[in-house]
């Protein structure tokens, strides 16, 4: 049995972390049975101090991309089946854009804006004892702000960050065009990543120009609905 460790639902999302959402999609895309563990204690036991990770018959695999590699190697499932070399390369580049660029812009919106933090990320800490909860929240948010600054995007003003986010959404929208999924009628590996991130960007309760930018692109909105309907038909947070 496979166990996937994550944070759990919030903001109308099946899972608040786009990386954990990606892992859910990968497992479901591969048709593998698994159970989800959203106990916060799993975070403190994470091999690299981050979620997601899986436990598969005693073997622990952390990081959503390495979870994908594990599925491909152990279960023989090709997430890019039928794609050309150029499409595979495009998919990989798009995944890196989502995970190394768009992710940080979403961190800014979710974690550093007080209203959005209360609507979503704060729920991660709900199981902590009340006396220490605000202290831990404040520490984590300071860490996020410092990391965003070190990463580079935190050095830009809000207008510049929004312009960069718009470029990411335009790229996703352009590749998607009028297709159901990024590369055609069926989802592939890149859809697990891009799908997870745009689903997260359109989360309920988020008030931000970044969300408005994504919502202004009709094919992205339809894509979110399609991903949610296919992989999370009974979701809710």
Annotate each language-model stretch with its function.
Residues 1-134:
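GST-like domain detector, emphasizing the conserved glutathione-binding G-site
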Residues 26-29, 70, 164-175, 226:
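Amphipathic alpha-helical segments that form well-ordered structural scaffolds
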Residues 30, 178-179, 230:
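Structured helix-beta-strand junction loops
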Residues 104-219:
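GST-like fold's C-terminal all-alpha helical module
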Residues 219-226:
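Intrinsically disordered, low-complexity polar regions and short flexible loop motifs
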Residues 227-237:
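C-terminal helix/juxtamembrane-tail motif
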